[in-house]
C-alpha cells in the first residue's frame, strides 16, 4: 500500500501543498486545477524531488507516464515498449501490437520512428510502455493529452482492464478522462492546500 504521511512541499516561503495524507491500494484519479502541484506530487513519489516535510512509504518499483513523452526518438513504438521488458522484442511483439490495435494505432504507425509520430500517438506509446513495465506503483501525469475522444475511451478501457488492485495515481484536470475511467477521484485541493 502506498502511504503519504503529512506531505508538504514549498518553494521558498510559498507552500504548494501542506500536510497531505493519503493511502492508496487501487487506482485513483488525482484531481486539482492546473498549477496546484499534481506533477510535483508525482515527482516526489518517483523520488525525483524531495518533500519539504512528511514521508512516502510503499512506492516500490515505479512505472510512469510523464507530461513529456520521454521516448527514444529513433525507435519505433514496439521497440520503445520493449525497452522496459526482459528478453527479446520478438518474445512480446505480437501482444504489444495487439494492445496498440486496441488503443487505435495501426500497423503503419507502429513502423515509424517515435520522432515521426503525432502527439497523441506518442502518448499511447508512453502509456503502453508504463503498462508493460514491471512495477508496484503506476504514476500517470495527464496521460490522455493529445488524444481524441474515441482514443481516450479506448485508452481508459485498457487502463481499467490492466490496473485493478494496483496503486495507480493518475493526475488530471480533464473531466472527460475522469468520466471515462470511472475511478474514485481524490480532490487534492480539498486535502492539502494551506
Question: What do these predicted ranges mean?
Answer:
Residues 46:
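Helix-to-loop junction immediately C-terminal to a conserved catalytic motif
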Residues 75-87, 95:
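Q-loop/switch helix immediately C-terminal to the Walker
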Residues 93-109:
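Conserved ABC ATPase "signature" region
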Residues 113-117, 121:
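Conserved ABC ATPase signature
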Residues 127:
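Hydrophobic anchor residue at the start of the ABC signature
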Residues 133:
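Conserved signature/switch motifs of ABC ATPase nucleotide-binding domains
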Residues 138-142:
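Catalytic Walker B motif of ABC-type/P-loop ATPase nucleotide-binding domains
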Residues 149-151:
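Helix N-cap at the start of a conserved alpha-helix in ABC-type nucleotide-binding domains
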